[in-house]
Amino acid sequence: KKGVTLREDDRFPCNAGNCACLPLDSYSYTCQSPTSSTANCEGNECRSEADW
């Protein structure tokens, strides 16, 4: 998994179909499959492009 930094233009940082997870120990979003566990994500949440 590649980390993605928060960009100032605030575009969705992941490919379509993936979701953005903000790990509890990081300030950079990571992209993961929507079926992945969100246990390590802030708010137990992985945000899809629709939620972005």
From Swiss-Prot:
The entry's keywords: Disulfide bond, Ion channel impairing toxin, Neurotoxin, Secreted, Toxin
Tissue and organ distribution: Expressed by the venom duct.
Keyword Secreted (UniProt): yes
One GO term describing the cellular component: extracellular region
Domain of life: Eukaryota
Cellular compartment(s): Secreted
Proregion span(s): 1-6
Keyword Disulfide bond: yes
GO molecular function, one term: ion channel regulator activity
Cysteines joined through disulfide linkages: 14-31, 19-41, 21-46
Function noted in UniProt: Probable neurotoxin with unknown target. Possibly targets ion channels.
Domain observations: The cysteine framework is IX (C-C-C-C-C-C).
Name assigned to this protein: Conotoxin Cal9.2c
